[in-house]
Amino acid sequence: MGDVLISDRPPSPARLSHTSEKHPRVTLQELNVLRRHRELCDVVINVKGRKIFAHRVILSACSPYFRAMFTGELEESRQTEVTICDIDENAMELLIDFCYTSHIVVEESNVQPLLPAACLLQLAEIQDICCEFLKRQLDPENCLGIRAFADTHSCRELLRIADKFTQHNFQEVMESEEFLLLPVGQLVDIICSDELNVRSEEQVFNAVMAWLKYNVADRRQHLAQVLQHVRMPLLSPKFLVGTVGSDLLVRSDEACRDLVDEAKNYLLLPQERPLMQGPRTRPRKPTRRGEVLFAVGGWCSGDAIASVERFDPETADWKMVAPMSKRRCGVGVAVLNDLLYAVGGHDGQSYLNSIERYDPQTNQWSCDVAPTTSCRTSVGVAVLDGFLYAVGGQDGVQCLNHVERYDPKENKWSKVAPMTTRRLGVAVAVLGGYLYAIGGSDGQCPLNTVERYDPRQNKWCAVSPMSTRRKHLGCAVFNNFIYAVGGRDDCMELSSAERYNPHTNSWSPIVAMTSRRSGVGLAVVNGQLYAVGGFDGTAYLKTIEVYDPETNQWRLCGCMNYRRLGGGVGVMRAPQTENYMW
C-alpha cells in the first residue's frame, strides 16, 4: 500500500448543527397540559369568580400587561391569586388559552368582549384579528356601531376603515336605524366630510331632516348646528326654495333662515361667488373608485391553475377572488363593459376555445359566453371599439394567424382579416384606433415584427419592428406609448424592455426590469405600469415590479399569492362594495 498522507493541520472537530422545528410546538403543548392538570401553576387569575390557573412566566412572555404586573412592584406580583375586574371572563379564558396554544377563534358572539380584553392585556395580534373580523362584517346597517366601538377602544385602523365605508356607502347608511340613533357630534363628523359619496347635496339635507324628526323634541335645538354642514349653496334652486325654505322647522329658526339666505345669495349673485367661497360652497369629492388589477390563471408548480387574485394598489394587498371553472394557462384576458373575460388557454391536457366572464360586483364567473371558432392558447386578447378581439395563438396543431372578434350584444364571434404572420405568444395593444400584434413566435423562432389592424379597412399592415425578438412578452399602452417588456428570444428569458412611438413609428429602449420575465403580464393601474409574474429561466415568479417613467427605473412592489407563468392580467374599476375597499 502507498504511504498515507497526513496533514500538518490539526483536524477540525466534528460538528452537526440542528434546530428543531417541533420543539417549540411540543413545549407549548406540554406547558398547556401542565396548566390543564394544574401542575407547577404559580398564579390563579380570578375574573368574576371564574378561576383560571396559569404560569406567570407564560403570561408574562405573551402579555406586556401581565409582565408589568408580575415583574414590577405591584401588590399582584406577590399574590398567588389575582383578581381582574372590568373584563369578560370568557374572553379572558380565550386569551389565556391563546397564550398556551397560539390558537383562537374569533366570531360574532365573542368579538365584542374579546377586543377590549385584548386591548387590556396588550395582545396586539388578537386586537388585529378582532379588527380584521369586524372589517369583514361591515355593512350599511352596522358600520356606525362598529365605528363607535372602534373609537371607544382606540382601534385607529378599524375606525379609518369604518369611516371610509360610511362615507362610501352613505346613501344606504342614512336609511339605517343606527343613523337615526347617532349623537349629534357623530352626525356632524360624518356629514362635514368632503369624501361623502352622494349623488347630490339634497341627499345630505334629507338625511339630516330624517335624523332630526326621529326625535324632534330633543334635537331641534341642534338643527342650526347640523345644517351649517349641509352645503346649501350647492342645492338646486327649486329644492332650496321649495323644500328647504318651506320647511317649518327651518323657517322657525333664525340661524337656519340665515343659512338659506346665504345659499340664495350664492345662487342669485353669480358675480359675487368668488367672494363667497367657503366650506359650504366646496363640492364634495365622491369616493373615487380606483383601479384594481386581476391576475388570472397561468402555470404554477407544473400545472395549469384556475386561481384568480386581485391587487389593490392603495393597500398593496393581493386578495384571492372566485376561481375560474377551468384551469387555464396561456389564457387571454381583457375587460369589456366592466366585465373580465378569460379567453381560451390550455388546461394542462387540452387546448381550449371556451370563455369565462367575471363580474366583480358578484364575485362570480359565468360560462355563457360563446366559444371562439378555434381553440387557442398563448393568444392575444384586447378590446377595440366595443368588440373583444382574439389574435393568433396555437391550437395544438399549428401556430395561428387567425383573428376573430366578439360582439357582446349578439354573443357571437366572427372572423376578421388574418394577420400576415402566424403568431403564438403574441402581445396585443390598442392605440389610436388600431390593434397592434407585437412579437410572438411563428412556430419556428421568436419574432420582432409588429403589425397593426385597421378595423375601418379590415386590413393588417406592418410597422417598425422591435429591436429584440420576443415571444411570450408583456405589452401595455402607457402615456401614449406601447411598452413591450420581457419575453424570450432565441436562447434565454429577457429582462429588457422597449417602447413604441406611433408618431415616429420607432422603438426605443427603456431600462431593463429587475428580473428576467417570460410569460409576464403587463398592465397600467391608476397611472402606473406593473409587470406581473412570469418565468426567469429557473423559477416561476410571483414578484411584481412597477416602472417609473420619470426616473426610468423599475422597483419591486410585493408578491402575488401564486407564482404565475402565462397568466393573464386585466384592470377594472373597483366595485362599489365593501369587499373591495381594503
Curated annotation (Swiss-Prot):
Extract the ranges annotated as region (Disordered): 1-21
Which InterPro entries does this UniProt record tie to the protein? BACK (IPR011705), BTB-kelch_protein (IPR017096), BTB/POZ_dom (IPR000210), Kelch-typ_b-propeller (IPR015915), Kelch_1 (IPR006652), SKP1/BTB/POZ_sf (IPR011333)
Any GO MF annotation of the entry: actin binding
SMART domains listed in its UniProt record: BACK, BTB, Kelch
Keywords attached to this Swiss-Prot or TrEMBL record, sorted alphabetically, are: Actin-binding, Kelch repeat, Repeat, Ubl conjugation pathway
Known CDD domains for this protein? Answer: BACK_KLHL20, BTB_POZ_KLHL20_KLEIP
The question of whether Repeat is a record keyword is answered with yes
Q: Which residues form the BTB domain?
A: 41-108
Q: Which GO terms describe its cellular component?
A: Cul3-RING ubiquitin ligase complex; cytoplasm
List GO BP terms, alphabetically: negative regulation of synaptic assembly at neuromuscular junction; proteasome-mediated ubiquitin-dependent protein catabolic process; protein ubiquitination
Pathway the protein takes part in: Protein modification; protein ubiquitination
Enumerate the Kelch repeat regions by residue range: 292-338, 340-386, 387-433, 435-480, 482-527, 528-574
Q: Which domain of life is it from?
A: Eukaryota
Briefly state the protein's biological role: Probable substrate-specific adapter of an E3 ubiquitin-protein ligase complex which mediates the ubiquitination and subsequent proteasomal degradation of target proteins. May have a role in synapse differentiation and growth.
Q: What is this protein called?
A: Kelch-like protein diablo
Q: What lineage is on file? A: Eukaryota, Metazoa, Ecdysozoa, Arthropoda, Hexapoda
